[in-house]
Amino acid sequence: LLITAYTWTGQLTWDLLIPAIPSTILIGAIMMTNNLRDFANDKAHGRRTLVILMGHEGGTKLLGGLFAFTIAWTAFFAFTNKVPLVVLISSISFITAMKGVRILQSQENTVTMDKAMKFSALSTTLYHVLFTVGLLWSYWGDKIL
């Protein structure tokens, strides 16, 4: 989206960056969850990912921080009236994200940690759907009611 918008307009604006930054972070969080799940295998095969460099515990803390940053980013722009307040409904996705982080903190087997992948992907999807619902609600809500 950002590349297309930049190609068409020759500029990047906050209107495009406000939703794009959390999207990018959440997609990266899915990939980071995969790295955390495969930590032992990746380390044994000499892979040098951010998670390997930080360690399992550090990577898990960073993952939780990324989810929290996404919600804080959305809240900041909602409270500064850059996006409608109703998009804060997307914060519900944080609950699902933290379930995945808790599973990764347990450092059980990879089968158990597969659930963390599910929760990470689900929270990303939920965030985007609820953010979109919030935008649509703010646009059409007054017109329908």
PLM region spans:
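Active-site-proximal flexible loops/turns
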Residues: N41-H45, L62, F131
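Acidic (Asp/Glu-rich) catalytic motifs at the cytosolic membrane interface
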Residues: G28-V51
